[in-house]
Curated annotation (Swiss-Prot):
InterPro entries documented for this protein: Ribosomal_bS18, Ribosomal_bS18_CS, Ribosomal_bS18_sf
Protein's name according to its UniProt entry: Small ribosomal subunit protein bS18
A Pfam family assignment: Ribosomal_S18
Recorded GO CC terms: cytosolic small ribosomal subunit
Keywords: Ribonucleoprotein, Ribosomal protein, RNA-binding, rRNA-binding
Organism taxonomic ancestry: Bacteria, Bacillati, Cyanobacteriota, Cyanophyceae, Synechococcales
Classification via PANTHER family: 30S RIBOSOMAL PROTEIN S18 (PTHR13479), SMALL RIBOSOMAL SUBUNIT PROTEIN BS18M (PTHR13479:SF40)
Gene this chain is encoded by: rpsR
One function term, GO molecular function aspect: small ribosomal subunit rRNA binding
Amino acid sequence: MPPSFFKKRLSPIKPGDPIDYKDTDLLKKFITERGKLLPRRMTGLTARQQRDLTNSVKRARIVALLPFVNPEG
């Protein structure tokens, strides 16, 4: 079997660190320019972190910290 050419990605958020909906700079790293969430295979997050991220982004949108859609896009 040939060696794997793919590197194992490290999660950009350390396991156990809370994902806060008020930290918009962190949340914007995981959102496209059109306002959609990036998938796990692109972000390198665990399933639990992706779930927490999704809930945080939704909460930030509801309290108007993040837009639902990008007005230019």
